[in-house]
Amino acid sequence: MPDGWRIGFGEQLCEELKAELERAGLLDQYRILQIKEKYGSLRWYDSGNTSAGYDILEKYERISERTCICCGMPATRITSGWISPYCDACCPEGPSVPIDEYY
């Protein structure tokens, strides 16, 4: 998981997902297969989840689209080419668009 997302919401995501897996009695069998960024949003691959667990992950996918990938602050820009959300302070030089024009 990129540092900014880990800082911005990573712990909260894990706590919510853990509570759901404990509620469903699946915590001991649950395995995370991969966590990454793709097209500017969170991708989380696992060994199987509950419907409510997938709802939690979908919520954080949406949050990731508007969270700076570097620092965890609210994103204001999306870079072109390699699509990633950034705040004004972290946005690299080069082409980018305001986030509200992208989504």
Outline where the language-model segments fall.
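Long, charged N-terminal interaction/targeting segments
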Residues: 1-54
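Peripheral peptide segments
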Residues: 30, 50, 62, 75-77
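Short, flexible, mixed-charge glycine/proline-rich loop motifs
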Residues: 36, 55-66, 77-81
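Short cysteine-rich clusters marking metal-coordination/redox-active sites
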Residues: 68-71, 87
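Short functional micro-motifs and their immediate structural scaffolds
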Residues: 73-78, 92-95
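Cysteine-rich micro-motifs
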Residues: 81-93
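Basic, amphipathic alpha-helical/coil surface patches used to engage anionic, phosphate-bearing ligands
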Residues: 95-103
